[in-house]
Amino acid sequence: MSYSTRSISQSARFGVLASPGVNRARSVAGGASTVRMSSANVTSSAFGGSSAFAGSSAFAGSPAFNVSVTSNNGKETMQNLNDRLANYLDRVRSLEQANHELELKIREYLDKKAAVGSLDYSGYYNTINLLRSQINDATIDNTRLVLSIDNAKLAADDFKIKYESEMAIRTGAESDIVGLRRVLDELTLNKTDLELEIESLKEELIYLKKNHEEELAVVRSSARGNVDVQVDSAPPVDLAQIMADVRSQYESMMEKNRQELEACYKGQSENLNHEVATNTAALQTSKTAITDLKRTIQSLEIELQSLLSMKGALEGTLAETEAQYGAQLNHLQAMITQVEMELQNLRSDADHQSLEYKRLLDAKTRLEMEIATYRRLLEGEDTRFSQTETQKAVTIVSKEQSSSSIKKVKTVIEEVVDGKVVSSRVEELTETS
């Protein structure tokens, strides 16, 4: 909505003024009883055209007015308005051109982005899924190998405990064998002593036999002589019988000792042989178990080394794969960030251009409304001006017949909506001097 205001006052000036929304019409003043008036021809052009006033208006009486000054002011005002309109239109055209170029850039960018977004990444996705499945399989195998290693370690610990227990049993058996060997040595020494004692007894027996035979020989040789000696003495002692008794006693003692020694030796030997056989079997079993355990430990160590090497290779492959895809992901992330920044800049530029375009469009709309109002005022000014001048001339003549000076100011306010006059009212101000 815009308002145009026309004021008509009795002054010494005649001019045309224009402002946004408010337009002031010509003002006419007369100081004589006779008024002479000529119409003014107005030629106007909108949107970069030119406007000029042609015509003259003269008043007879005092004071006189120079209408050419008013005409020049109107021309300058219209020229300024036309220049401003031309500048606004040029700026609007340049901004429209820039907006069009920016829209083309945005469209090209969106087309390029759509073309990039429409690329087929199925091959990459398949490769990624394949690598993920391989990584999962390697992880499962690694976990399985870790479990196998743990089980092997537990089995090795069990075998180690068994080995230690068998070694303790073996050590006990060896210590028992050493003790039995000591007992055997003692028995051997006792046997040797007894054998030596038997030998000494045998030698003593031989010596006694020899002495007995010598004594018998002496007795027999003395008995062959014819010497008859009668001695009243105790009956003679039978030495042979005594020797035989002694021999039999010693032989019985020797036989008894020999039998006891043989029985003791046989019992201890049998016990020792039984213990040695038992311990030998246990030792052989322990040696066999130790050999099996060593073989098992060696095979498990070999398997552990192979699993550790496989684990290291898989970890290296996994690290290389993660590094490669991490680098690709970082590159893609950087590209996405750059594209987002470019898109944000384009959006900000587009928003700025849109705001500038709206501002200039509003200015253009207001200017077009002012031009339309100004054109409408110029087109309808002649008729209103002629009617108003006629009425004012009559009023002025009637007032000049009296001796007083009256100054009247009439203001015409028009309400314009979308280039159409909706309502109009007149305000009149009278001053008496």
Swiss-Prot record:
GO biological process, one term: epithelial cell differentiation
Molecular function in Gene Ontology: structural molecule activity
Organism expressing this protein natively: Xenopus laevis (African clawed frog)
Annotated region described as Coil 2, given as residue ranges: 243-381
UniProt region (Linker 12), positions on chain: 220-242
Region Tail: start-end pairs: 382-433
Region of interest: Head: 1-73
PANTHER family linked to this entry: INTERMEDIATE FILAMENT (PTHR23239), KERATIN, TYPE I CYTOSKELETAL 47 KDA (PTHR23239:SF378)
Domain of life: Eukaryota
Region (Linker 1): 110-127
Name of the molecule in the record: Keratin, type I cytoskeletal 47 kDa
